[in-house]
Amino acid sequence: MTRREMVVTTASTLAWLSSARLTGAEPVLKNMGGEGPGFANRSRAGGFDIVERCHDLGLGVVRVNVPQGGPDAVRGLRKKLDTYGMRCIVSVAPPRTDAAVAAYETSIAAARELGAVTTHASVTQRRYEEFDTFEAFKTSFEAHKKSVERAEPILRKHQVKLAIENHKGWRAAEHAAWVKQIGSEYVGVCYDFGNNIALCEDPAETYRLLAPLTLYVSFKDMAVAPYEEGFLLSEMALGEGILDIPGMVKGLQQRDPNMIFALEMITREPLRIPVFTKKYWATFDDSYSPLPGRDLARVLEIVRTTKKPLTTTAGLSPADALKLEDDLINRSIAYARKHLSL
């Protein structure tokens, strides 16, 4: 079956799933949420409200930004969340300068007013694309550390937490060491299940290091495939990739029975991870930020031995890409209902 045929044949399934939710046939997944990047095609189509969409899908949590419009807008969003019985995670970046501290505190106060379970920050880009030298990477990492130092007293004052995402900027060992060094109950990890594969980490090792520090999960399955300069990395519907989704979820729930798993099923072309290029290795240093050869070998073994068809939008119109996005999200939610206790 071609991708286009798959998109067309899923239309009736999507309609059934939507109607089932709207008629109350399925219970709310109180510990499963949605994040904006997973709805990118729907957002581009216009008229998108992430709270309404997550509610319609039967998700009990949503990641939002602080609304524009001041206190009235914040109160309006809180009222909507309360009406739907939903919780929220609020994206607020730590202050990069002393001059930004006051605005950051205003945003943290708004997050508290919204009843945020935690705030969220993904402050890095893909390090192998962003930086050409190790020195530039180190300067950036030290600046991010300083920004969280500025943020922590404000978080403590308002009793609001910050979950720092592993966003292809730091390997798990350095990320975990940093969070432990901060030593604050208000600073932890937003654990993205897939991102560190791009930094040549076995998902089991990422889990071992980040799970004990996790405040919430950016939830997805993943798959890999070879290409001439390295490997391709793609988000997949839950249960259709290479990750041990049931095992990872169970382990995190043993640590926190109310752990939130916010779905981020991004429907796009696979990412290119160019591990066979000189630029990829420019930011790794043997002592400050090591990437041992055995880790590269392990990831390449995973690439060689796992055969999964990757998510792709190549050749799809915007309308068909949106249909594929809806299908992948709905398949993920159906999997969670059947196999996970969320």
Give residue ranges: language-model regions.
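Twin-arginine (Tat) signal peptide motif
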Residues: 1-5
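Histidine-acidic metal/acid-base catalytic patches
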Residues: 7-16, 26-31, 45-52, 172-186, ...
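Active-site acidic/histidine proton-transfer and metal-coordination neighborhood
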Residues: 16-21, 61, 82-88, 96-188
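Acidic (Asp/Glu)-rich catalytic clusters
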Residues: 26-27, 51-56, 70-89, 105-116, ...
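Hydrophobic faces of well-ordered beta-strands that scaffold small-molecule active sites
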Residues: 30-37, 62-64, 88-92, 119-121, ...
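N-terminal targeting signals for Sec/Tat export/insertion, comprising classic cleavable signal peptides
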Residues: 35-57, 61
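Acidic-and-aromatic substrate-binding clefts and catalytic sites of carbohydrate-active enzymes
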Residues: 40-44, 64-74, 94-102, 129, ...
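Short acidic/His/Gly/Ser-rich catalytic and metal-binding motifs that mark active-site loops
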Residues: 44, 121, 127-130, 225-229
